[in-house]
UniProtKB/Swiss-Prot annotation:
GO terms for cellular component: cytosol. It holds the Pfam family tRNA-synt_1c. Zn(2+) binds at residues 98, 100, 125, 127. This is Glutamate--tRNA ligase. It comes from Shigella sonnei (strain Ss046). Its EC number is 6.1.1.17.
């Protein structure tokens, strides 16, 4: 049997991390079994579904490289198919027309609740033989079995049972002729030959209804697996107050897709004590029986740790392709300065996100208007003039501009003046970067370049002279 899974988001907003994890689990299960992964857009909610949301979902899937083998299919383009199946069910007697008014249904609901009963349709039209005009408004309901129970073996939670007496006669077509969500899902899974449905636990109550409809259609019933929800680190349902929840917001915040995927796969699944997984390892090791039944807690610090790992573990040339977007957001012209791959090597240890890297690299490419006030006050003082003049001259004398030779020039300055490296290094760092913090000074000066470094040292000397004149 060929394994076939699907990810079926409703395009009413962005792709959130819960949906992304569900998509990842479905994708991994299919890839692990050499099967196929289908993308289906469940856009039957015409009022809330938007083209922007569809685009956001696609962007998130593409950024995570969760490629699909079929689709995207759109439910709104399959209404004729759904209605044809409903008409077939009406003929076979597994569905019926319901003419009950909203007023009657509301009165029935209130009466049942007053008695402490669970609100449900009483089946009046199921057993009615009244004649109605063809154009009289009605809904179509599924004739749910009235006896027995629905049992399915959830691949994560184990056997789950629902009594048919607890299930309503579900509306499968509205008065406007549009099919309902639960019915469309059934026909789609049938037509698309989905073998395994992996989705959130909020769909558990839909499952017995969908199984009954599939059986009424004499269609194969897929295997179901319901993934637990994701909570914030405070144990409450994950929401914006816990930080970003949109996949693309993590892109915007400077995370690599590899880091988010690695974090999401471990958010409810484990393979021994292993924490770091390549995409290939995820595919090789992923199984549903290793997915936890318990809710997971989203920990941003753990994700940040993973992101820092991947910034330094992945090839710098690859990381640079993602960094480019953030550089563009900062409007930095990188034509005069180090290659972005070299920048990744320079800043990788210091920066935990690509956004942080982009925001802290401008001095490599563009001159700054002024020095950081605190750093200048502390390090660009008259006592720094001589070390800066000497190191400037030694840097200017370098014919082979390498980080090693830059280091020798700084060390030689300290030796000549018989001062510690800090007496040379800190004024030099502020002079060439404009701030008090940077990567190792030799590689920083080397990356900034000989001409620009000397110009900035001269600017720092002018700054010191100006301060002296003001005193």
């Amino acid at each position: 049997m060929k394994i076939k899974t699907r990810f079926a988001p409703s395009p009413t907003g962005y792709l959130h991390v819960g949906g992304a994890r569900t998509a990842l689990y479905s994708w991994l299960f299919a890839r692990n079994h050499g099967g196929e992964f289908v993308l289906r857009i469940e856009d039957t909610d015409l009022e809330r579904s938007t083209p922007e949301a569809i685009e956001a979902i696609m962007d998130g899937m593409n950024w995570l490289s969760l490629e699909w083998d079929e689709g995207p299919y759109y439910q709104t383009k399959r209404f004729d198919r759904y209605n044809a199946v409903i008409d077939q069910m009406l003929e076979e007697g597994t569905a019926y027309k319901c003419y009950c008014s909203k007023e009657r249904l509301e009165a029935l609901r209130e009466e049942q609740m007053a008695k402490g009963e669970k609100p449900r349709y009483d089946g009046r039209c199921r057993h009615s033989h009244e004649h109605h005009a063809d154009d009289e408004p009605c809904v179509v309901r599924f004739a749910n079995p009235q006896e027995g129970s629905v049992v399915f073996d959830d691949q994560i939670r184990g056997p789950i049972e629902f009594s048919n007496q607890e299930l309503d006669d579900l509306i499968i077509r509205r008065t406007d002729g549009s099919p309902t969500y639960n019915f469309c899902v059934v026909v789609d899974d049938w037509d698309m030959e989905i073998t395994h449905v992996i989705r959130g636990e909020d769909h558990i109550n839909n499952t017995p209804r969908q199984i009954n409809i599939l059986k009424a259609l004499k269609a194969p019933v897929p295997v179901y697996a319901h993934v637990s929800m994701i909570n914030g680190d405070d144990g409450k349902k994950l929401s914006k107050r816990h930080g970003a929840v949109s996949v693309m917001q993590y892109r915007d915040d400077g995370y690599l897709p590899e880091a988010l995927l690695n974090y999401l796969v471990r958010l409810g699944w484990s393979h021994g004590d292993q924490e770091i997984f390549t995409r290939e390892e995820m595919i090789k090791y992923f199984t549903l029986n290793a997915v936890s039944k318990s809710a997971s807690a989203f920990n941003t610090d753990k994700l940040l740790w993973l992101n820092h790992h991947y910034i330094n573990a992945l090839p710098p040339e690859y990381v640079a392709t993602h960094l480019q977007w953030h550089i563009e957001q900062e409007n930095i012209d990188t034509r005069n300065g180090p290659q972005l791959a070299d920048l990744v090597k320079l800043l990788g240890e210091r920066c935990k996100t690509l956004k942080e890297m982009a925001q802290s690299c401008r001095y490599f490419y563009e001159d700054f208007a002024e020095f950081d006030a605190d750093a200048a006050k502390k390090h660009l003082r008259p006592v720094a003039r001589q070390p800066l003049e000497v190191v400037r001259d030694k840097l200017a004398a370098i014919t082979d501009w390498t980080a090693e030779n830059v280091h020798h020039a700084i060390q030689a300055t300290a030796d000549e003046l018989e001062v510690g490296m800090g007496k040379v290094g800190m004024p030099l760092r502020v002079a060439v970067t404009g701030a008090g913090r940077s990567p190792a000074l030799d590689v920083t000066v080397h990356a900034i370049g000989k001409t620009r470094s000397i110009e900035r040292i001269n600017k720092a000397l002018d700054f010191i002279a100006e301060r002296e004149n003001q005193q």
